[in-house]
């Protein structure tokens, strides 16, 4: 037998033997493959109970603050992707609202996960600034101009950003999008842009798309160089591949999860390159402050005088 054939045959036998061994293990130890995994140990429960007693969980002010300005929520809990699958599913987290104290979840994580159940349209500054929350990992903000909306940070997916725009238009009245702002280069703050504007309107100047200088370079390069590693880290850090329940995926701390929809990008037509720059768009005065190399390689704060 040629040596190559021998190696292939030996590898096949080894693989078959491994499969038989794993199959036997699975048959003998079905609990090992329980989707719950191991229940919390006595040590873990004692540690958790100690934290529960030590931290100020009786302070409910954050829950009161999170409810302020609530206007409306949509009649649905799922947002479908253009490809036909579910892009966003708040229904899968409703168990968090049962009021139950889950021994398998760190108490601070459970508290944050409940706070992140905010879902719908909120008024931040009366008559001027609004947010749609709970449609993606980040929040999308809408500033009311003289004639239209200035959209801040259009989420991760075109479908969730589009749904947010539809919600605010259906609730407060139809207005065109006259501007978009990318606050920084992380994907959850720009990849839904094609859900709120058309590229032709940006190219023609009909819509002003504002971003910090160097945005395109860092938005693309960071995901090329570090995207795979960041995705794998997220899967481990937030258990995003597990079922959504007290023994699996619970939350992603700054939001529920990342929307699984259409990732898009439109190049900005107005860059902020100075430390401080001022722009007035549709009657709204905005002062931009460069804060690059803080939370992102390129980033800016925006002040509304």
Model-predicted segments: where are they?
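Solvent-exposed loop/turn segments at secondary-structure junctions
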Residues: 136-139, 156-159, 185-189, 215-218, ...
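N-terminal signal peptide c-region/cleavage motif recognized by signal peptidases
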Residues: 19-22, 26
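Conserved beta-strand hairpin/beta-sheet module of binuclear metal-dependent hydrolase folds
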Residues: 114-175, 299-304
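Low-complexity, highly charged intrinsically disordered N-terminal segments
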Residues: 70, 74-102, 118-119, 225, ...
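N-terminal pre-domain segments of enzymes
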Residues: 27-113
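Metallo-beta-lactamase
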Residues: 123-124, 173, 210, 216-293, ...
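Bacterial N-terminal signal peptides that target proteins for export
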Residues: 1-13
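Active-site metal-binding motif and surrounding structural segment of the metallo-beta-lactamase
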Residues: 147-148, 158-209
